[in-house]
């Protein structure tokens, strides 16, 4: 939405501030090419920040891979579009890219038909590092505990799998 030079100017006031742990890109992921943010992410990496971006909630599996490669991401917020492409799933697993997934949001926004069909199980069983999160608590009436319970009740993930995801997510 914003011109890149405007974002660069805004961020110039924060570079070097050790109170920041990461950088994240969010908004309409299809508004402009992800490559436009490459310079900002190179600087963020130089500053030692963890690199994240909201991608793959609405786009394609190719968009997820492109974002990871172009921005050198450590983590992807959402990323569920990757489920449609086995080579992208393997790429995420092989490169240890974490997907921070918000199941209830994905169902309510129509990105996944229902919780039992959520691709988080596929990602987990394919070796992709996943975390379970809530998205906009007041809008989706959810929190992390409810997300775990809903995935379990839908038989998307077993109790053992959910516990493993929980433990790995704390690292």
Regions found by a protein language model. Give the residues of each.
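Short beta-alpha connecting loops at secondary-structure transitions
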Residues: 103-109, 131-133, 149-154, 169
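Mid-to-C-terminal alpha-helical segments outside catalytic/metal-binding sites
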Residues: 146, 156-171
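Histidine/acidic residue-rich metal-binding segments in metalloenzymes
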Residues: 4-22, 29-72, 83-97, 114-128
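Active-site beta-loop-alpha junctions enriched in small/polar residues
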Residues: 1, 26-30, 56-60, 79-81, ...
